[in-house]
Amino acid sequence: MDNQENDQKSPYPIGKTALLVVDPLNDLISEGGMAWPMAGTVIQDVKTVEHIHDLLKITREKGIKVAYAPHHRYREGSYAERKYLSPTQVAQLGPGHMLSQGKWGGDFAETLAPKAGEFIASEHSCSSGFAGTNLHAHLTENEITHLIVVGMITNSCIEATVRSAIDLD
């Protein structure tokens, strides 16, 4: 089957589909990141970085829009007003301040970083890439009706982002 035939059979209309990359930040997805001791084996075994990189390459070649939903980067005073904290927020407040603004751990992983012109949503502070961000407004403004969602961490930010997306108009 050639690519043109694949495009015609795709349930994802190119002009209305976006690849949403959630939390491709060094502390979460890169060797040497603070979450690597917990997630590194799985990331390597299932080739997470390689698969996301390949998907980015293909979607960019096809002209599919790419958007990013980054997690909040720690700054002095982060979460001072929150009554309840998620495990990631606790890790950000702990020693080393995971996902620190302006440090390697809070930067996008080099091979998964946004290209010029790709949308980077405002930072989400807990799990969903939609909660408290401008992501929904951007997707709506660009008439995006279909999402392909990849990134970190499946049972937290990916799941919450997908569940939120389904609930939106």
Task: For each feature predicted by the language model, list its residue ranges.
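Internal catalytic-core helix/loop-beta-alpha segment
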Residues: Q101-V150
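Active-site acidic carboxylates
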Residues: M1-P114
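Short, hinge-like loop/turn segments at secondary-structure boundaries
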Residues: K83-P87, L139, I166-D167
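Glycine-centered short loops/turns at secondary-structure junctions
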Residues: E61-I64, E143, D169
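Short, well-ordered beta-to-alpha junction loops that form the rim of enzyme active sites
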Residues: A69-H72, E123-H124, M152
